[in-house]
Amino acid sequence: MKQKKFMLSEDMIPNSWYNIQADMPVKPMPMLNPQTKEPVTVADLSQLFCEECARQELNQTDRWIEIPDEVRERYANYRCTPLVRAYGLEEALGTPAHIYFKNESVSPIGSHKLNSALAQAYYCRQEGVTNVTTETGAGQWGAALSYAAKIFGLEAAVYQVKISYEQKPYRKSIMQVFGALVTPSPSMSTRAGKDILTKMPNHQGSLGTAISEAVELARMTPGCKYTLGSVMNHVTLHQTVIGLEAEKQMEMAGEYPDVIIGCFGGGSNFGGITFPFMRHNFTGERKTRFVAAEPASCPKLTQGKFEYDFGDEAGYTPLLPMYTLGHDFQPSNIHAGGLRYHGAGTVVSQLIKDGYVEAVDIEQKESFEAGCLFARAEGIIPAPESCHAIAAAVREAEKCREKNEKKTILFCLSGHGLIDMAAYDQFLAGNIH
């Protein structure tokens, strides 16, 4: 029987996260304090994040950052996650390509987001923080943060983008099961939310708006810090457990990827799967292609500008050097709520600028077609966000079929779609074009 899954034991969970900034040929430009226009300091960021995350955010020298023992113990509840050979998908496509996926959907909340939520909640508890706030789109990050906060004895408040709050009611229920206070954004509970609703009463929400509300609440609440699930360097750092495991598992499979693909919203799962492999491109040892698959309706990488911009709509965050559509950009109401963000993380933006990362945009219909194909071939219903990575992998595999090329493709299945079936209903009914 052909080997389908490549598994690592719990003692193979990485001991350290990989900090790609230490190896980048060109370092990212600094984030700026919006008041002084000077590079932000750990002290600046510590007003927003816990201090350890602020230090990790600005660390451009240490290649390896040790994972605390207690976080590794929590990782062991679901890590190491499987690397899977997608024989069924290969057969369905009639491609000579070998397709692998790293299955992050097996985590307790169904996605990769827990990898950083556990780390951020742990550091907050260690520093005496009692409350955390965050934003969430589809609810994957909100669910992860709610779960992690409960584990580490913190109170969590989550602002969920209104359209996703309405489209995905069971994610709200999951967050509430873990004890979080969940509020649709924009709301009347913050100045940022009130300002937006005054201008646009029917505003359906965006991640940029939800970030503004979460940041504002954190600033107003004693003993509270803001946490987030993507974009920032420390978040992507925590996600590198994905690629570090995948590197060992690909070795077990006796192959090395020619192309690695991740869906792209802010960059956390994309960086998580690609960065550990990318260091070998920096040295010239490998020539792997890295493809970021973003929604065509929110094309910050393929159509955005590289410039300084705020990470949120109200302008509460530092100024970030990134590919952006503008912090006031209002994305359309696609079902991949976790990808509806106007900008890209600073590290990925620099890597795009320097030619190490390619970007493709995927129409919503194509993403769901690929998601259904994958589900029928592999038995896993993917999250709408993950469907974008699958669609990009399908494109690559079809090129291999046309050229009769045998290539090895790896993508990150960032989450399952079992709480997203209303979106699939819309697709199956022919309502997604």
Language model: regions and residue ranges:
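Active-site/ligand-binding loops adjacent to catalytic centers
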Residues: 66, 196-234, 242, 254, ...
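Active-site-proximal loop->helix
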Residues: 141-204, 300-310, 421-429
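A short, small-residue-rich loop immediately preceding and capping a beta-strand
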Residues: 116, 124-163, 256-269, 290, ...
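Alpha-helix C-terminal capping segments
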Residues: 119-129, 143-155, 176-177, 274-284, ...
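Positively charged, low-complexity intrinsically disordered leader regions
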Residues: 2-129
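Active-site nucleophile and cofactor-binding loops and adjacent substrate-binding regions
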Residues: 103-114, 132-141, 232-235, 261-266, ...
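Claisen-condensing/thiolase-fold acyl-transfer catalytic domains that form or cleave C-C bonds
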Residues: 264-272, 364-430
